[in-house]
From Swiss-Prot:
Name recorded for this polypeptide: Cytochrome c-551
InterPro entries, per database record: Cyt_c-like_dom (IPR009056), Cyt_c-like_dom_sf (IPR036909), Cyt_c_ID (IPR002324)
Position of the signal peptide: none
Classification via PROSITE patterns: CYTC (PS51007)
Domain of life per record: Bacteria
Positions bound to heme c: C12, C15, H16, M61
Protein modification: Binds 1 heme c group covalently per subunit.
Record annotation: effect of changing I18V: In strain: 50
Organism whose genome encodes this protein: Pseudomonas fluorescens biotype C
Entry keywords, A to Z: Electron transport, Heme, Iron, Metal-binding, Transport
Alphabetical list of SUPFAM superfamilies matching this protein: Cytochrome c
Substitution effect: E29D: In strain: 50
Function: This is a prokaryotic monoheme cytochrome, unreactive with mitochondrial cytochrome C oxidase or reductase. It functions in nitrite and nitrate respiration in Pseudomonas, but it is also found in other bacteria.
Amino acid sequence: EDGAALFKSKPCAACHTIDSKMVGPALKEVAAKNAGVKDADKTLAGHIKNGTQGNWGPIPMPPNQVTDAEALTLAQWVLSLK
């Protein structure tokens, strides 16, 4: 499954859109912030799977029920957005 399909099939869109900030940051902003960062795909995959807090303000991102492979696919797709 590709990243766009996973984005639609998982609860990502409850808080994120590609272009605009909602509860969470716009995915294009995430891509821009992480452009050129070493191992950004692995770091982002960990945030997707395990949740994170404090990177984009006070609202935490909850853990998501995804496999390691799905998290990495989603992360690589997010980072590809321009």
